[in-house]
Amino acid sequence: MRPLFIRRARQLVTLAGSSAAPLVREKMNDLQIIENGSVWIERGVIIAVGPDDELAHRFADRIGEADVIDARGKTVTPGLIDPHTHLVYAGSREHEWTMRLRGATYMEIMNAGGGIHATTKATREASEEMLYEESKRRLDLFLLHGVTTVEAKSGYGLSFEGEIKQLEVAKRLHDTHPVDVVSTFLGAHAVPPEWKDDRDGYIRLIMEVMIPEVSRRGLAEFNDVFCERGVFTPDEARRILEAGKAHGLTPKIHADEIEPYGGAELAAEVGAISADHLLRASDEGLRRMAERGVIGVLLPGTAFFLMTQAADARRLIDNGVPVALATDCNPGSSPTVSLPLVMSLACLHMRMTPAEALAAATINAAHAIGRSHVIGSLEPGKKADLAIFNAANYMQIMYYYGVNHTEMVIKGGKIVVNEGKVCI
């Protein structure tokens, strides 16, 4: 592989110096920007970052052997990272979206055959090959929007066979697609209909059968639970998360989306790497999260699509909670693959600054999936994952909302998107 020399970026947004701990409070606005910046890459790794004149002098005798990318007038950032998706599923639910727009309640949609169980049915019935192809198309779209790493949850199988199938597809995507896929087991996404009269039996199935097998096969790094009234209680979630820890799976938690339910407190108690949603988290829960360094992953696209109030990002940031952003890509409440759009929504609906939003979609997102030592910032020794945007500065990526400014994506030192087209 020839060296790669990215030169003369109008803004090179490095986010350097935050690999050991996520950015919090006012530090989220310090993006470590280099004007007229350049990056030298070899064998998929960043070798040097700095002003163009410095790197041009340092590598003067080697420029002839490198592939040179002229980034004049453009903004270069770390590859974007999506730390909360439900990437692998079958089918879509636009019909229930129409029902919701006409005033139908969630229970009315469920009773009409919609909701999560509709996706569970479609995902169970889909072949592994069909799931792979459908999910690969979504992953291509993530890549086209500057995303180089995604977290992917199971949770639409809700059976031993179904959950394993989803995770096997996620692993295959990771092995075959430029985008890195980091897998999370979410067997505790809901209680499936066939277990509605024996929910504790389903919980035991998760703890005693699913988790050990997922761990044995190396199909996931994280174990997630949807902790919400009517889904899984804090006590049930604690049992499931502790069972995962016993098998080497790091806890994550869907927390306090609908009402204050102790999810944020539980995340701190069990040492979760992240707590996600947090629309209704208590002040005490946020205080404990900040003390334990639990990342708060916010999902403004979900609130936007459901036409509800978004999480109070300013409250989290002011409490010292490290904040990350994610699409929550899923067919029911956030059918989007555009992390830049989510960043715009974070500014418009949650009053985050553009700098905070970019930090939340890069280095803090890397912390939320345990990858801050290798991705999330542009520093020597890190993996060469970068996005080049046709934007004069990083703010324009979000300011011109709904526009995909991604011109080029580099993954592991290889150009995988060029002029808005995937070139795998």
UniProtKB/Swiss-Prot annotation:
Zn(2+) binds at residues 84, 86, 254, 328. Its cofactor is Zn(2+); Fe(3+). Its main location: cytoplasm. 4-imidazolone-5-propanoate binds at residues 93, 156, 189, 257, 333. It comes from the Bacteria. Keywords: Cytoplasm, Histidine metabolism, Hydrolase, Iron, Metal-binding, Zinc. It holds the Pfam family Amidohydro_1. N-formimidoyl-L-glutamate binds at residues 156, 330, 332. Its EC number is 3.5.2.7. Binds 1 zinc or iron ion per subunit. It is found in: Cytoplasm. It catalyses: 4-imidazolone-5-propanoate + H2O = N-formimidoyl-L-glutamate. InterPro entries: Amidohydro-rel, HutI, Metal-dep_hydrolase_composite, Metal_Hydrolase. One of its GO terms (cellular component) is cytoplasm. Pathway: Amino-acid degradation; L-histidine degradation into L-glutamate; N-formimidoyl-L-glutamate from L-histidine: step 3/3. Catalyzes the hydrolytic cleavage of the carbon-nitrogen bond in imidazolone-5-propanoate to yield N-formimidoyl-L-glutamate. It is the third step in the universal histidine degradation pathway. HAMAP family: HutI. This is Imidazolonepropionase.
